[in-house]
Amino acid sequence: ALCAAALLRAEPLIRPDRVYLLGHSMGGMLAPRIDAEGGAFAGLIFWAGTPRTLDALILEQNEASLAAMPPEQRAAAAPLVQALREQFAALPRMAEEDAQHTHILGNLWAWYFKEILTHPPEEYLRRLTKPVLVLQGDRDAHLSVERDFRRYEALLAAHPDAAFHLYPGLNHLFMPSPTGAIAE
């Protein structure tokens, strides 16, 4: 994103002071950090993003899936979700070298989660002074209106140039979604 923004600013037909960063989903979660690390963007757009940490979101999604399972499947899957919860809880104490050789969620390296968790999105959101636009569908199966969209509203309540738009009937990809099911 930083390199793409630099290329855009170098284009003679583009006003360098009008380059915005749009992040979708995890990109929306990371956008404030990307900007803080040198983006110099005119503003930020969070499209189906979250102000929560990645581990909290993944655990919530797994627990929701677990709750929706028939009892016999839930009994078999519950230990896997508990193991994931324990892996995430152990990350802050995990040595860097161990994190580089440990997998979480199949083949994802623990160091990735360990690094990303040292940069909570809320810390960056509290420091934002540039324009912010938050967009979310109310049928998003991956996010929560209360825990994500409303949290953005609360965190950015005093921000003079923050706008929020919740779109009825749209899912995570901003497509019409009658029920909000992941399959839609």
Feature map (PLM): residue ranges:
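Alpha/beta-hydrolase active-site loop
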Residues: 1-11
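Alpha/beta-hydrolase fold nucleophile elbow
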Residues: 14-23
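Catalytic nucleophile serine of serine hydrolases
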Residues: 23-25, 48
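Short glycine-enriched nucleophile-adjacent loop
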Residues: 28-39
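Accessory cap/linker subdomain of secreted extracellular hydrolases
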Residues: 43-127
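Short beta-strand/loop motif that positions the catalytic acidic residue
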Residues: 128, 134-136
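Short alpha-helix in the alpha/beta-hydrolase fold that links the catalytic acid
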Residues: 130, 141-155
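Catalytic histidine neighborhood in serine/cysteine hydrolases
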Residues: 156-179
